[in-house]
Amino acid sequence: MVQNHQTVLAVDMPQTGGSKYLDDDGKNKRTGSVWTASAHIITAVIGSGVLSLAWATAQLGWLAGPVVMLLFSAVTYFTSSLLAACYRSGDPISGKRNYTYMDAVRSNLGGVKVTLCGIVQYLNIFGVAIGYTIASAISMMAIKRSNCFHKSGGKDPCHMNSNPYMIAFGLVQILFSQIPDFDQLWWLSILAAVMSFTYSSAGLALGIAQVVVNGKVKGSLTGISIGAVTETQKIWRTFQALGDIAFAYSYSIILIEIQDTVKSPPSEEKTMKKATLVSVSVTTMFYMLCGCMGYAAFGDLSPGNLLTGFGFYNPYWLLDIANAAIVIHLIGAYQVYCQPLFAFIEKQASIQFPDSEFIAKDIKIPIPGFKPLRLNVFRLIWRTVFVIITTVISMLLPFFNDVVGLLGALGFWPLTVYFPVEMYIAQKKIPRWSTRWVCLQVFSLGCLVVSIAAAAGSIAGVLLDLKSYKPFRSEY
C-alpha cells in the first residue's frame, strides 16, 4: 500500500524536492526549524522531573550528584544523535522517511522488536501522562495552601484533597486533546518552554535566597547520612535518585515525531542534532543549577518536589507564579507526549476499519466569525476516554517521586539507549565484534544495569508508600 502511494508521487512530482507546497512524501511542506524543535524538546524534557532533582542530589551528595547529571546528559545527547540518523532509511537526504519511533524500528530492525518497542513506548507515554497529572495537582494545591497559610498566618494546617485538582487538569486535557496534529502544537510548545524557564528560575532564586538566609551551603560530599536514614534506605534512595534523573532527561520516545516537523534542506538529521545540542545544554545547565541550589538550601531535608517543599515562606506570590507556570507547562507537555500515541491509535483504527464513517468522518461545527470547527467523533471519544483513565489512575497512585523514578527507570534503557544503538548498528552495518560494535554494546549494557537498579529503588519506594495509603483519599 505504501509502495503504490510512493509510485504515484514519483509520477506527479520530482522525488528530490517535492513542490512549493508539498514535501517529497506528498505531505504538506514541513516548516520546523532548530528553534521550534528545541522548543518541543525543552517542553518535553524540562518537565516535572526538574523539581525532584534537589531530592536526587541530596541522596547522591555533592560529588556523585552533579557527575550523574552530566553523565545522563552526555548519554542522552549521544543516543539522540544516533536516533536522529535513523529518521530516513538509506540516504540521509532523500531516503524513505520514518514518521514515528516505531517506523524507524520497523525499517531498521523489524520483527518482534517492533512490537516490543511499541509496547514500551506507548506504556511509557501513558505513564508520563499519569506523572504529569499528579505533578499538576500538587502545584495547584501548593497555590491554594500558600494562600490559605498567608491568610491564617500559619495557624490553619490547610489540609486538602488532591482529587478535585486532578479532575480539573483532566478536563483541560480533554479540551486540548482535540488538537488534531503534532504540527499544530508549536504555539503550545513555545508557551510551555517559556513556563518551564519561569518556574525553574523561581526555584533557583528561592534556593539562592534560602542559602543566603542560612548563611552557609548545606549538604555533604556523600549525600544523606546514615542515621537520618538506615543503610538499606540509603541504597534504595540512591537507586531511586538515578531513576529520577533518568526521567528528567527522557524525551527520546518523541524525538522522531519532533524531527518529522522539521523542514529540509539542510537535512533533518543536521537540524535535529543542532536542536538536541541546544536543548540538552540548556536543560543540563538548568538541572545543575536547580538540583544543586535546592540541595545547598535544604541539605539532607531537600524535598521531593522543590517548589511545593519550600514551606510557605515569603514571597508567597513568587511561589504562586512558579506553581502556576508548572501547571501551564504540564498542560503543554502532556500534549507533546500524548499526541504520538493518539496518532498511532487513530492510524491503526483507520487501517482496521477503512470504510467506517465513525472513524473517518469529520463533523463541521459553525463558529460565528471563524472557520467552522472540524470535529472527528472517534477522536473526541477515544482521546476523552484516554484522559479519563490517566486521571483516575493518578487519583489512585499519587506518589510523585516514586512514580517519576519508576517511569524514568523503565523507559530509559529500552527507548533512550537500546533501540537507538541497535538501529544505528543496523543502519551503518557495523560488523559484529568490531571495536565500535563492542564499545556500543558495553555502553548499552552499562545503561541497562543503571536502569535495573533505578527500577528496584523506585518499586521499594512505592511499596513503602502503599503501607500508609488509602485509595482516592490523598490528603496533603
UniProtKB/Swiss-Prot annotation:
A Pfam family assignment: Aa_trans
Gene that this sequence comes from: AAP3
Alphabetical UniProt keywords: Amino-acid transport, Cell membrane, Membrane, Nucleus, Symport, Transmembrane, Transmembrane helix, Transport
GO cellular component, as recorded: nuclear membrane; plasma membrane
Known regulation of activity: Inhibited by carbonylcyanide m-chlorophenylhydrazone and 2,4-dinitrophenol.
Effect of a null allele: No visible phenotype.
Transmembrane segments: 34-54, 58-78, 123-143, 167-187, 188-208, 278-298, 301-321, 325-345, 385-405, 406-426, 442-462
Positions in the Extracellular compartment: 55-57, 144-166, 209-277, 322-324, 463-476
Gene Ontology BP term (one): basic amino acid transport
Main location group: membrane
Family: Belongs to the amino acid/polyamine transporter 2 family. Amino acid/auxin permease (AAAP) (TC 2.A.18.2) subfamily.
Localization, UniProt: Cell membrane; Nucleus membrane; Endomembrane system
Name of the protein in its database record: Amino acid permease 3
Residue spans, topological domain Cytoplasmic: 1-33, 79-122, 299-300, 346-384, 427-441
Known role: Amino acid-proton symporter. Stereospecific transporter with a broad specificity for GABA, tryptophan and both neutral and basic amino acids. High affinity transport of cationic amino acids.
Tissue: Expressed in the root phloem. Detected in stamens, in cotyledons, and in major veins of mature leaves.
Molecular function terms, GO-annotated: amino acid transmembrane transporter activity; symporter activity
